[in-house]
Amino acid sequence: MTSQSVAKKLNHCFSDQALFRTALTHRSFGTPNNERLEFLGDGVLDFVIAASLYHRFPDLPEGDLSRLRANLVRQETLHRLALELNIGAFLRLGEGELKSGGAQRPSILADALEALFGAIYLDAGFEASRAVIEKLFAPLLDDLKPGQFQKDAKTRLQEWLQGRKKALPRYHLLEATGAAHEQRFEIACEIESPALRTVGHGSSRRIAEQVAAEKALKELLA
């Protein structure tokens, strides 16, 4: 099996093989790497998913559409799709990153998938990238049930406290470890009344805050 199996699963044949190689090149390997392609692919992905949701759910308000999109483009979802494509087997990583398990790291795999979207956009244009993304995300889009979609934990916690005329929670960064693109965050969620403090961990501040908020909700509703 070669890296071309990834392109085949994406149903795209690269005219510019250098773009394909760069999309699979982590910054630890050297330059050029996939960081700029990941930036581009992130924007393409956001737009394609936003447009798909807009047309699929004509009656949903903006807030619900935003939450659905956030759920679809989050790191966990991209990581799962990258595993299905076996991207990790073909990543070009520096020796240290390779030894530390970088080929299985969720953030690296998610970034590489977005880089591939960016590479396809540059290689063949927007319609080609849109077709690849829509096909890859079709099962996830088909499974969406907006009527059952739940607001994120921070929003639900805020609404629970507001409904009881309580002060809003405060989120504090306790610790951030790791290199810039591989950081782990520890966030505390503190509630004044009823007195409660929970801690969440994640690969971004947003994820860590959501984890801490979810823990607080479980405590309050227990």
Curated annotation (Swiss-Prot):
GO terms for molecular function: double-stranded RNA binding; metal ion binding; ribonuclease III activity; rRNA binding. It catalyses: Endonucleolytic cleavage to 5'-phosphomonoester. One of its GO terms (cellular component) is cytoplasm. Keywords: Cytoplasm, Endonuclease, Hydrolase, Magnesium, Metal-binding, mRNA processing, Nuclease, RNA-binding, rRNA processing, rRNA-binding, tRNA processing. It is found in: Cytoplasm. Mg(2+) binds at residues 38, 111, 114. PROSITE patterns: DS_RBD (PS50137), RNASE_3_1 (PS00517), RNASE_3_2 (PS50142). Residues 152-222 form the DRBM domain. Its cofactor is Mg(2+). Coiled coil: none annotated. One of its GO terms (biological process) is tRNA processing. Residues 3-125 form the RNase III domain. Its main location: cytoplasm. It is an enzyme of class 3 (hydrolase). CDD domains: DSRM_RNAse_III_family, RIBOc. It holds the Pfam family Ribonucleas_3_3. InterPro entries: dsRBD_dom (IPR014720), RNase_III (IPR011907), RNase_III_dom (IPR000999), RNase_III_sf (IPR036389). The active site is at residues 42, 114. Its EC number is 3.1.26.3. It comes from the Bacteria. Homodimer. Belongs to the ribonuclease III family. This is Ribonuclease 3. It comes from Dechloromonas aromatica (strain RCB).
